[in-house]
Amino acid sequence: MPGLSCRFYQHKFPEVEDVVMVNVRSIAEMGAYVSLLEYNNIEGMILLSELSRRRIRSINKLIRIGRNECVVVIRVDKEKGYIDLSKRRVSPEEAIKCEDKFTKSKTVYSILRHVAEVLEYTKDEQLESLFQRTAWVFDDKYKRPGYGAYDAFKHAVSDPSILDSLDLNEDEREVLINNINRRLTPQAVKIRADIEVACYGYEGIDAVKEALRAGLNCSTETMPIKINLIAPPRYVMTTTTLERTEGLSVLNQAMAVIKEKIEEKRGVFNVQMEPKVVTDTDETELARQLERLERENAEVDGDDDAEEMEAKAED
């Protein structure tokens, strides 16, 4: 089956001052030739004078073939198909927004393209028709090209009735819902922080236990907190949640409570690693670390037992 393709948005060309995502195809004397990724790879050009605000010493340091770049549209000739672009006029804030919009629009595109493949479409016109009857309906409804469809599809995970108004047959609707659920159902993330908690005063380990218990009490039903000992005085705090921001907030809150409690007892609190979302690789490394410590502790216990047995034998 041939690879189907279609632009991301209803309008065939970007407007002047739109910030768009491009892929650099080649570099010539006049400038860089690029493909506009959101507009079915139509060609555009970044003139050399629009690459940087500074004097250009090396083009390759500014732009490279094969790399994606956020650029702003400065001229569009729809009849001739000329699109002039600028890299130097894009602010860091605009680049961040462009990347976010591109990521969400690409997700919608991937969903609809997979729907087309499952339904065995063979023509680009069929894919474009699917866009017209789904993504572009929501983009137009919410007046936010790229975001409208993404937000509607995300909402459809919990409320598929949002798709009822679309002009889809039963097969199209079923395949679309299945693909939306597969791609957009929220994934739980694990959040971790490493802390040091110690008390060298009279209450010692009891003060540490009390402070850690106070931190555990910050758990909620949807965000349970776990605290594991790595090696005194270092502990790892973790929580698993669908809400990344709230998860970070809950761990920060628990750390503040632990700090307050241990310092009341004249103990010490240090943050070794601020709360962050951890990957499977991080988790595997932590599990390996804990396993190694457990093994080392078991070996120490074994040595103690051996010494006791030797002492008894001598008696």
UniProtKB/Swiss-Prot annotation:
Keywords assigned: Acetylation, Cytoplasm, Initiation factor, Mitochondrion, Phosphoprotein, Protein biosynthesis, RNA-binding, Translation regulation
Residues covered by the S1 motif domain: 17-88
InterPro entries per UniProt: NA-bd_OB-fold, S1_domain, S1_IF2_alpha, TIF2_asu_C, TIF2_asu_middle_sf, TIF_2_asu
Positions bearing Phosphoserine: 49, 52, 158
PTM annotation (N6-acetyllysine): residues: 141
Activity control mechanisms: Activity is regulated by phosphorylation at Ser-49 and Ser-52, which stabilizes the eIF2/GDP/eIF2B complex and prevents the eIF2B-mediated exchange of GDP for GTP, thereby preventing the formation of the 43S pre-initiation complex (43S PIC). This results in the global attenuation of 5' cap-dependent protein synthesis and concomitant translation of ISR-specific mRNAs that contain a short upstream open reading frame (uORF) in their 5' UTR, such as ATF4, ATF5, DDIT3/CHOP and PPP1R15A/GADD34.
GO molecular function, one term: ribosome binding
Post-translational modification: Phosphorylation at Ser-49 and Ser-52 stabilizes the eIF-2/GDP/eIF2B complex and prevents GDP/GTP exchange reaction, thus impairing the recycling of eIF-2 between successive rounds of initiation and leading to global inhibition of translation, while concomitantly initiating the preferential translation of integrated stress response (ISR)-specific mRNAs. Substrate for at least 4 kinases: EIF2AK1/HRI, EIF2AK2/PKR, EIF2AK3/PERK and EIF2AK4/GCN2. Phosphorylation on Ser-52 by the EIF2AK4/GCN2 protein kinase occurs in response to amino acid starvation and UV irradiation.
Region of interest (Disordered), ranges: 292-315
One record GO biological process: stress granule assembly
Modified residues (Phosphothreonine): 279, 281
A single GO cellular-component term on record: cytosol
Description of how the protein assembles with itself and partners: Eukaryotic translation initiation factor 2 eIF2 is a heterotrimeric complex composed of an alpha (EIF2S1), a beta (EIF2S2) and a gamma (EIF2S3) chain. eIF2 is member of the 43S pre-initiation complex (43S PIC). eIF2 forms a complex with at least CELF1/CUGBP1, CALR, CALR3, EIF2S1, EIF2S2, HSP90B1 and HSPA5. Interaction with METAP2 protects EIF2S1 from inhibitory phosphorylation. Interacts with ABCF1. Associates with ribosomes. Interacts with DDX3X in an RNA-independent manner.
Physiological role: Member of the eIF2 complex that functions in the early steps of protein synthesis by forming a ternary complex with GTP and initiator tRNA. This complex binds to a 40S ribosomal subunit, followed by mRNA binding to form a 43S pre-initiation complex. Junction of the 60S ribosomal subunit to form the 80S initiation complex is preceded by hydrolysis of the GTP bound to eIF2 and release of an eIF2-GDP binary complex. In order for eIF2 to recycle and catalyze another round of initiation, the GDP bound to eIF2 must exchange with GTP by way of a reaction catalyzed by eIF2B.
Descriptive protein name: Eukaryotic translation initiation factor 2 subunit 1
Organism (species): Rattus norvegicus (Rat)
Upper taxonomic lineage: Eukaryota, Metazoa, Chordata, Craniata, Vertebrata
